[in-house]
Amino acid sequence: MIKILYKSNRQIAESCTLADLEELGFDDVLWIDLVEPTGDEKRTVEEFLDTTLQSRATAEEIESSSRYSETETTIFANTNFLIPGPDSYSTEAVSFIISEGILVTIRQVPLRTLTDLQRRILALSTTKLYPTGYHILVAIMEGRIDLDADMIEIMSKEIEQFSKRVSLGENVNEDFLLDINQLQENTMMVRENVVDKQRMISSILKSDKFP
């Protein structure tokens, strides 16, 4: 699936039609969001930007030290978004490409941060707050950091509850230990996820392509 946010008469409009991308000018497009992209969608975007998009397997295999790269015209960045489950968290690789002020995001599942931002941008409908793809990328990171902070707050409350249960002399049985172990794993995942984003943001801010 493809969603294109583009400038039209000083407002921001959207299109979910691949053919529209071929009709739009390079200066019109702000954000191309690809969710489980088809081969045709990827090829059309690659031709439009004159660059190569990473596959999901490539994005997932990239080591943390190599999650950022750039060419003369394009920035490539990869990070993981945490998806909370009933007990444990999972991660979803997201690729970001910025070329000449156009942001491309590539993912395989719906993500609340991106969906909410698209709704907000279209509701405001003005280009004043989001004149380029760089501004949209910053907004995505801000929204994601807020969600990560919410997860940390929830885990802090869970840790506090476990501490109270121990203080009250509750029997530390196998289920209790399993819950503690899962909480530790979740905490480590959130920490690694936050550090991963810090590295990505730091690299982008250091780039001479960032306005």
Regions found by a protein language model. Give the residues of each.
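Peripheral, non-transmembrane regulatory/ligand-interaction domains of membrane transport proteins
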Residues: M1-F210
